[in-house]
């Protein structure tokens, strides 16, 4: 068994108008931010329950009451998303797994990676991106220049791992649209995200 990895979560402070803008409409910016906060809280709770060497929140904005104990908080660097992801890995001195705040359905089982016989983990997303990237020997150069937020992002990032021993994680759906939100909530009905979505949907009727 390899050393426990650092678990990285890259996220934005859930402020109205700054997060989940593709949920508006049908949701207001305030409701979209509430859903983002619930998704982030679920994600951080899962990371907190997953064995790890360190747990690091790479944050744009300020931490709030949604942050559980046990996390280091570092600020995101300026630049494009590829640069910010690369910089997140630069905080690690050993194996690391990075995820975002858009997959509240993640579980400790999904995040419990072991690099004993592989060099990388890759978690593809339904929209063509990726929800997880793990590196046994973090190299920021593997991310720099990858076009982000396009249908090709995942394929380009996966190709960057050529020559490494890669394990693919299950394909997950990011929460980008209201349709995504419904499907994701259905896969994790007991979470904060599903509860908040049900509350907001009922309140809007």
Place the predicted regions along the sequence by residue.
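Short beta-strand/loop segment that forms part of the nucleotide-sugar
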Residues: 52-61
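Short phosphate-binding loop-to-helix
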Residues: 67-97, 150-153
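Conserved donor-nucleotide/metal-binding helix-loop-beta segment in metal-dependent transferases, i.e.
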Residues: 104-130
